[in-house]
């Protein structure tokens, strides 16, 4: 364990904070050989308990300062720096653990007492510093034990050589440049007050002490104390030799929000507090660029995204230094500075003529322009665009093309314009990609044919826009991804507005079609899908019969009328003259069709049927229809094996039609239809119409008798 021999009285007093001063019974600055000589060995007394070890007993006179301890401390710090150990982290045990271990295994020699006192002193410093930072600033060099073991192994035979070396080293290292005069009486705070009083001053003094000692260790080790905002200072603000003056941190009204001007020995630079970015130039004139920050380039590694996405080691990139013009958009997020191409403006500084063209385009409300750069396209399947999966698939395409390791300027990547700056225009319901220099149209995509569009959801990908559409030549689905200069949600919002406008126009067009005030010339390309309710198919029964023909009759009802017509036709014609045909019976219509030619021989409405009956022969069937005012016609049929099925079907159609007429007629309106049976009519209309119903009943009675005859 090495103890620095060049401590300032003010630094030690700042650490003690007025605690009880303790003196060590042994000179901590004496050489090894001086402590081990015969005189000291004869007079040295081992303390009986820890209280005497802490220096509360008698105190002998301290010996002269020894420069060899300083040499050992510097050598051990140099070796620790070579082994890449963190000099700002203390790996010593706690004060209680060290005290218990030292009490059990304390050596009985004077050299063991010297190590005990030095360790107690350093433990007090560590406990005080741990109160503020959680870890002390003092380095435990006890692990560098091989040097100490070599000294013990060498024994007294090498003491004479060490005396000669000490004399030479004292001449070189007795007064190193920049170090104050050594102190002989070093006071170390003890008790609980040393752990609680003034943790801020403890940390500053300890940082000053070991920062100065490390600065003298070696040239290559001096780089650990960088000049960034995270590095410890070499002293407290009250010290006159501090590298930081009281006005080191300044906030100027000329600086943007979040910026601070920092002054130190390296110069004046500007610190952006939210992101931790530093730059030499004032932030008002240019944003931070690579190569201008005093921080190390390793600090630009994208580490925040690694925990979220779990990329492999090769997926993290650093921003390469760029010598191009600074960005026009000001300070960007720190994640965006680590993308695969340099964090610069997607388009160079426009010439005044180009600015005028852009302003003219933006002035036109029908055209919206966005500066983009094509990252390529990825082939997709129809299953990936299913509801609930399309958003995940599009985001995966954005992630794949945004963070891949290949060169984005490679023309084989599938990007429009070979990775150069483009203009994405939304004009006349069309998405266009235009080359900004010569206004060459590279691609035109109708917005109505775009299946899906979206914006990157990952951290730092809010400037990535993608849309999915079917290629005209290959008919495959492609997801095109673009890196936008402005937030990509602006493009998505504009597309949403255009689609809403298109849907509104189509709804208005449908309303015009329904109102029969439509200009068909404007709706040639608009597909209309009008769904009409399917017509209800009525039950139709077909019967194979022989059609005997039709004859006019004098009365609309009567079995004798039907029998007379059937007898006249059967007597005047033979079976060969009958026409084979089909009779289709529907609830509304009776249709007679030719069996071979399907020609319509007759069509009768059921509502005009006045009477039906089966003839004297069970194979014959006939019904009377009203052909006009006071004009009636009788249609006759020959059925096989009998006419029962046909007569029942026609009777059922008549009953269904009659029921529909009753349902459609209002209760107060009168009807010209034949009345139902007398009993039901009497219940409805009362006794006032009984006489009229009875007269109708007389006309319907022969119908019932005729329908029951075989």
Swiss-Prot record:
Subunit structure: Component of a complex, at least composed of APBB1, RASD1/DEXRAS1 and APP. Interacts (via PID domain 2) with APP (with the intracellular domain of the amyloid-beta precursor protein). Interacts (via PID domain 2) with RASD1/DEXRAS1; impairs the transcription activation activity. Interacts (via PID domain 1) with KAT5/TIP60. Interacts (via the WW domain) with the proline-rich region of APBB1IP. Interacts with TSHZ1 and TSHZ2. Interacts (via the WW domain) with histone H2AX (when phosphorylated on 'Tyr-142') and the proline-rich region of ENAH. Interacts with MAPK8.
SUPFAM superfamilies: PH domain-like, WW domain
Matching Pfam families: PID, WW
Biased composition (Polar residues): 223-234
Residues modified as Phosphotyrosine: 547
Encoding gene, per UniProt annotation: Apbb1
Name assigned to this protein: Amyloid beta precursor protein binding family B member 1
Primary location recorded for the protein, binned into one broad class: membrane
Coiled-coil segments: none
N6-acetyllysine modified-residue sites: 204, 701
Region annotation (Disordered) ranges: 143-256, 276-300
Lineage: Eukaryota, Metazoa, Chordata, Craniata, Vertebrata
Gene Ontology molecular function: amyloid-beta binding; ubiquitin protein ligase binding
Chain ranges of the PID domain: 370-509, 542-699
Subcellular location: Cell membrane; Cytoplasm; Nucleus; Cell projection, Growth cone
Signal peptide feature range: none
UniProt organism field: Mus musculus (Mouse)
Keywords recorded for this protein, A-Z: Acetylation, Activator, Apoptosis, Cell membrane, Cell projection, Chromatin regulator, Cytoplasm, DNA damage, Membrane, Nucleus, Phosphoprotein, Repeat, Repressor, Transcription, Transcription regulation, Ubl conjugation
């Amino acid at each position: 364990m090495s103890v620095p021999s060049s401590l300032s009285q003010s630094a030690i007093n700042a650490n003690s904070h007025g605690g009880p001063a303790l003196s060590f019974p042994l000179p901590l600055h004496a050489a090894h050989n001086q402590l081990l000589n015969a005189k000291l060995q004869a007079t040295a007394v081992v303390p009986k308990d820890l209280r005497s070890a802490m220096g509360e007993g008698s105190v002998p006179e301290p010996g002269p300062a020894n420069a060899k301890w300083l040499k050992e401390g510097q050598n051990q710090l140099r070796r620790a720096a070579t082994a890449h150990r963190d000099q700002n982290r203390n790996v010593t045990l706690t004060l209680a653990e060290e005290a218990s271990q030292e009490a059990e295994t304390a050596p009985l020699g004077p050299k063991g007492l010297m190590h005990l006192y030095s360790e107690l002193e350093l433990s007090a410093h560590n406990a005080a510093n741990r109160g503020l930072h959680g870890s002390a600033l003092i380095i435990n060099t006890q692990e560098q034990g091989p040097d100490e073991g070599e000294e013990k192994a060498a024994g007294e035979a090498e003491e004479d050589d060490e005396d000669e070396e000490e004399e030479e080293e004292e001449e070189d290292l007795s007064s190193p440049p920049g170090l104050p005069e050594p102190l002989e009486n070093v006071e170390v705070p003890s008790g609980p007050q040393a752990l609680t009083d003034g943790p801020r001053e403890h940390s500053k003094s300890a940082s000053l002490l070991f920062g100065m000692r490390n600065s003298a260790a070696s040239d290559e080790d001096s780089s650990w104390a960088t000049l960034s905002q995270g590095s410890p200072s070499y002293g407290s603000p009250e010290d006159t030799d501090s590298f930081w003056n009281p006005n080191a941190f300044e906030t100027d009204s000329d600086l943007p929000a979040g910026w601070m001007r920092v002054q130190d020995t390296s110069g004046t630079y500007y610190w952006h507090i939210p992101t931790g970015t530093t730059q030499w130039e004032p932030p008002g004139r240019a944003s931070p660029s690579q190569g201008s920050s005093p921080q190390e380039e390793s600090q630009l590694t994208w580490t925040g995204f690694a925990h979220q996405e779990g990329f492999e080691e090769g997926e993290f990139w650093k921003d390469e230094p760029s010598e191009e013009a600074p960005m026009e958009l000001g300070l960007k997020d720190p994640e965006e500075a680590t993308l695969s191409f340099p964090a610069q403006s997607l388009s160079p500084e426009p010439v005044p003529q180009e600015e005028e063209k852009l302003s003219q385009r933006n002035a036109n409300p029908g055209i919206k322009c966005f500066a983009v750069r094509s990252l390529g396209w990825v082939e997709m399947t129809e299953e990936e665009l299913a509801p609930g999966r399309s958003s995940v698939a599009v985001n995966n395409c954005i992630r794949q093309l945004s963070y891949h390791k290949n060169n984005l300027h490679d023309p084989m990547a599938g990007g429009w314009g070979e990775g150069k700056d483009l203009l994405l225009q939304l004009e006349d319901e069309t998405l266009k990609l235009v080359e900004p220099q010569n206004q060459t149209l590279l691609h035109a995509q109708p917005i109505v044919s775009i299946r899906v569009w979206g914006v990157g959801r990952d951290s730092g990908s809010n400037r990535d826009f993608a849309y999915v559409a079917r290629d005209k030549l290959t008919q495959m689905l492609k997801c095109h991804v673009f890196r936008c200069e402005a937030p990509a949600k602006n493009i998505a919002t504009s597309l949403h507005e255009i689609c809403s406008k298109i849907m509104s126009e189509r709804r208005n067009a449908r309303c015009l079609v329904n109102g029969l005030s439509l200009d068909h010339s404007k709706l040639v390309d608009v597909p209309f899908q009008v769904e009409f309710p399917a017509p209800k198919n009525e039950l139709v029964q077909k019967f194979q019969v022989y059609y005997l023909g039709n004859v006019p009759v004098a009365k609309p009802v009567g079995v004798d009328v039907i029998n007379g017509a059937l007898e006249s036709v059967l007597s005047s014609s033979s079976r060969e003259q009958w026409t084979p045909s089909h009779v289709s019976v529907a609830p509304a219509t009776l249709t007679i069709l030719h069996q071979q030619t399907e020609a319509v021989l007759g069509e009768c409405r059921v509502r005009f049927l006045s009477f039906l009956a089966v003839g004297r022969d069970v194979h014959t069937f006939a019904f009377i229809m009203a052909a006009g005012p006071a004009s009636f016609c009788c249609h006759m049929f020959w059925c096989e094996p009998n006419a029962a099925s046909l007569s029942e079907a026609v009777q059922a159609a008549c009953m269904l039609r009659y029921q529909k007429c009753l349902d459609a007629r209002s209760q107060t309106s009168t009807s010209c239809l034949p009345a139902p049976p007398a009993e039901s009519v009497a219940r409805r209309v009362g006794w006032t119409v009984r006489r009229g119903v009875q007269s109708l009943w007389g006309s319907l009675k022969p119908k019932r008798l005729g329908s029951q005859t075989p």
